[in-house]
Amino acid sequence: MATYKVTLITPDGEVSYDAPDDEYILDSAGDAGYDLPASCRAGACSTCAGKIVSGTVDQSEQSFLDDDQIEAGYVLTCIAYPQSDVTIETNKEEELY
């Protein structure tokens, strides 16, 4: 199991923590004490949406985002595993509509 540095740019500021590559970013953020927005926790809505600034994730389990949104860097943190050090802007649900 690899561990990566996850940096979250939230409306309240920037936070970083170490996350395993086999745990969803939403869950590892919660384990690290950071409360991110979430609803379905299954990749089927947009409540937990963020936008990748740098790095890569595996979000192959998601069913909500279209190809254009994924290419633009949007990510559903509830079903995304870090695959490198990654920086994500959180609270991006409004931008999807």
Curated annotation (Swiss-Prot):
One of the entry's Gene Ontology molecular-function terms is: 2 iron, 2 sulfur cluster binding
Q: Which PROSITE patterns match?
A: 2FE2S_FER_1 (PS00197), 2FE2S_FER_2 (PS51085)
Coiled coil start-end: none
Q: Is Transport there in the keyword field?
A: yes
> Which family does the UniProt entry place this protein in?
Belongs to the 2Fe2S plant-type ferredoxin family.
What's the stated role of this polypeptide? Ferredoxins are iron-sulfur proteins that transfer electrons in a wide variety of metabolic reactions.
Per its record, how is this protein called by name? Ferredoxin-1
UniProt source species: Picosynechococcus sp. (strain ATCC 27264 / PCC 7002 / PR-6)
